[in-house]
Amino acid sequence: MRHQRLEGRHIIRIAPGEYHVTTGGGVISTLLGSCVAACLFDSESGVAGMNHFLLSNHRYSRTMPFCFTEAGRYGIHSMELLINSLMRHGARRENLRAKAFGGASILVNRAEVGNFSCVGSVNARFVREFLANEGIPLLSADLEGERGRVIYFDTTDFSVFVRKIRLQRSLVVAKRDRNVWEHGVQAHDVEPDSVDLWLPG
């Protein structure tokens, strides 16, 4: 997590595996490829936060709900960390609203095959499913596609600015996400029943 000031605004930049919650305004930003970010807020209390995560698993099912899968447990853990932090800062769960971003499918090369090639849509499907299951309204979303995104979540008015990034930079982000995904898969192989939060090495 990095803190910066840009044109007088306080910007908090989060990386994969991180989240941030604030009551004092400011902007939370992140760079997304296949990962997803959920922006959650309670407009009555003024509490807002964002996470950045990636589901990692060898196998994905088109029919089984993700919340029941090994990878889904990690996603649930990431979402609950954010929600619990929001509530500790004064948000009420029934007041939470969401916006979701990311989940791009970026192929580093056209010959790329395997589960990583669908991980973006898997992440997008998970975040929609989780929010629906928890009864948290999804007010807006920019999910999937073939380009990475930089997002800026303004926690003073809960607006989100989305900027699609160029193909070359999207490919760099895809390599980062693949490393994160492989690290997560290896962790599941070693401890298949554990749920861990991790950062790219």
Swiss-Prot record:
GO terms for biological process: chemotaxis. Keywords: Chemotaxis, Hydrolase. It catalyses: L-glutaminyl-[protein] + H2O = L-glutamyl-[protein] + NH4(+). One of its GO terms (molecular function) is protein-glutamine glutaminase activity. The keyword Hydrolase applies. It is an enzyme of class 3 (hydrolase). Probably deamidates glutamine residues to glutamate on methyl-accepting chemotaxis receptors (MCPs), playing an important role in chemotaxis. PANTHER family: CHEMORECEPTOR GLUTAMINE DEAMIDASE CHED 1-RELATED (PTHR35147:SF3), CHEMORECEPTOR GLUTAMINE DEAMIDASE CHED-RELATED (PTHR35147). This is Probable chemoreceptor glutamine deamidase CheD 1. It comes from Geobacter sulfurreducens (strain ATCC 51573 / DSM 12127 / PCA).
